[in-house]
Amino acid sequence: MKKLLQLSIIILPVSFFLIFFILLTEENQFPGADYREFDLPVFELKILNNDVSIANSDLEGDYVINVWASWCITCRIEHPYLASLAKNGIPIIGINYKDEKIDALEWLSKYGNPYQVTVQDYKGTLALDMGVTGAPETFLVNKGKIVAHYEGEINDYVWNQVFDPIIQERGMFK
């Protein structure tokens, strides 16, 4: 009995240390990824280039929402990748986040416009309702529900690891 007690005094702390160490060193490959499903918030905002209002109820099917701004350096880095997605038939809705209209229009004119439509979220209200903490952030929308969310630059690797498995599983963009 005494030997068992001595053995448990040694094994128990070592076990806790190993478990704690494993949990601390476990690497989350995509810390910016969030797979909680939630409804796209209700909104009505003006379209960036013509001041016509658009509401969430006007958006149908499967699409990507990209939150961007002209002042965002990472948005500039990911922009060519978004253009390639659009060229390959992925519909992208832009949310211009806390930006000046003239700056946003100039930016799109200079770098190209991969968005089917861009709404102007001057105050960041819609972005806040969606859980946005900054730009860029990208959302995958399936049947009016946000099914994936990524904070940070979208590139081929992130797209293939974070979004593509969900797209394949749900049969999106067909």
Model region roles, listed by residue range:
Residues 1-46:
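N-terminal targeting signals for export/organelle localization
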Residues 44-53, 118-121:
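Short gly/ser/thr-rich secondary-structure transition/capping motifs
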Residues 54-76, 82:
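Short active-site neighborhood of thiol/selenol oxidoreductases, capturing the structured segment around
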Residues 64-65, 92, 138:
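Hydrophobic beta-strand anchors of alpha/beta hydrolase catalytic cores
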Residues 76-111, 122-128:
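Structural microenvironment flanking redox-active thiols in thiol-disulfide oxidoreductases
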Residues 90, 116-117:
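Short, conserved active-site loop motifs that form the nucleotide-linked donor/cofactor pocket
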Residues 110-114, 121-167:
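Thiol/disulfide oxidoreductase modules built on the thioredoxin-like
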Residues 167-174:
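Short, solvent-exposed cationic patches
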